[in-house]
Amino acid sequence: MKLNRRMFLATTTSAAVLTALAACAKNGSGSSGSTAGVPTAAPEELQDGGTLRFGIGSAPANWNAATVDGNVVDVSLVMKFVSPFVVDWAADGKATPNPDFLTKLEAAEVGGKTVVTVAVNEKATWGNGRKWDSEDIKVFFDHVKDPSYSWATVEGLDKVEKVEIVDKQTAKVTFNSVYPDWSNALAGVTPRELMADAKTFNESMAGATKFNNDYFAGPFKIKSYDESKQVITLERNDKWWGATPKLETVTLHVLDDSALGQAFANKEIDVLDYIFSADVYQQASGRDDAEVRQNTGLQWRHIMFNASSGPLADKAVRQAIVRACDREAIAASDLAVLPVDAKKTLLGNRFFLPVQEGYQDNSTSWGHDVEAAKKLLDGAGWVAGSDGVRAKDGTKLELVMTIPSNAPVATNEANLLQKQLGEVGIKLSVSTVEIDKYFPEYINKKNYALTAFTSEKTQYPLANVGQYYASTSQSNYTGLSVPEVDQHVAKIGSTPDGAERNKLANELDKILWENVFNIPIYQRMQLTAVPKTLRNFGAQGLASFRPERIGYVKS
């Protein structure tokens, strides 16, 4: 999950089905035809050349997307152009290997364990000129359990028991049990040079100017990062062995959220993904050469708690905040004027989206109820003072919500929550911090009390259930450690039956509601504005994209 899924192996783990789903596509196609969100075109219909310009929220704090600081949506976007994503996902979430990277990805159940045979394409080449080999796979997994490596999450990766070298291109990966989401653990390949030691892994690409193309292998490479203009420029990778990209360059411009809509309207950027405000939607709709494409979104908005100290360490306080929080009002305000029914976007589940098998609304006992919130606080000994603010043992119930600068959605949510919590005797102040420091200095270091941000799901609903919630995860921003949560995370990861996994996930979600790790608010529908002539890219939904296929139709 990225600070960001349909499980394609949700209902079976038979060897036959595992192998069939992972069978290599003969023609190398990972798409399933045009959708409303992604109009397609054949290569011969597209221009050779052109630039695609994105807006992003901040420059990368770390170009290694596997690290805590690099595990953000903006870095993930860059990586989709320059780094190997060896699995393609179609619009229905089904996966097939990308033959530019892999010639085999097959799984079987052997002795109660999932065993996967992986063969890399002998043409695949790292940026340093070295060919891929099976050692890259083995060395990667050799370091997964090393705590000195700053992993964002090792969930799934840590289930690999051993990696055996079959030949120069082929490795056999054995998991410690039957593992339905095995392909998620093998969806990328990392050069062994980046895994050399913890310092290299953690720090060699820490900083906006410290990218290193030696560690990448994709249709594009990073040409530059202009610090003064805050622009990342990607160019065609001269070591790329696949089809020549149709685009010549891709640029990513660091912009405040508040500036994105106008930048798109002014034709300064070409992609406006996940439009989430009325003003921005109107700006995008007004651009004469553009259109807004729509699809099921993977992003979800939530309020996060730091429960490691202070009043929020009291579960009753967290529960009272849930009951005082009017999620429907927040969603309606955030999504006003957009072509979206806010009520239908409310999310009652942390793992499944409403369109996915396994979804059930587990929030029904935690709806907006001011009187219930007051009773929780009364029962926990928080007494209202003459100023209306509650206190206990001389400590006032005062909290600070930390939000990034120039983030209108977060500002709106903070203002609404401030009023809602005030009704039950909780004083909420708002602290706005520099967006570049928001995650590395505040959230990652648990230097906050409350916050709200967007996460992005993947095609695997249950692949990283412990990322925010397991006591050992570096991305557990709450500081909470609940044994029952850890037990369910472990069970979900080792249960082969899809229906049983879904049941366990919903049990876990109910435990998370009870303990209030966070508050899911709503799912963002994917509204993406792009030029009308752009093909093979748009509102992707569950589908991945091939960077080399993106282009503009010939005039």
Regions found by a protein language model. Give the residues of each.
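N-terminal lobe/hinge region of extracytoplasmic solute-binding protein
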Residues: 55-109, 142, 215-216
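Long beta-strand-rich cores associated with HINT superfamily self-processing modules
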Residues: 35, 528-555
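Append "and occasionally in soluble cytosolic enzymes with long acidic Gly/Pro-rich linkers
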Residues: 235, 313-419, 507, 554
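Ligand/substrate-recognition segments at binding pockets and active sites
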Residues: 227-229, 383-457, 498
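Ligand-site clamp/hinge motif
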Residues: 236-283, 427-429, 434
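Gly/Pro-rich hinge or "lid" segments in bacterial periplasmic/extracellular proteins
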Residues: 73, 80, 90-92, 188-245, ...
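Surface-exposed binding/hinge segments that line
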Residues: 47, 154-200
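Extracytoplasmic/peripheral linker and loop segments enriched in polar/acidic and small residues
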Residues: 9, 45, 423, 427-439, ...
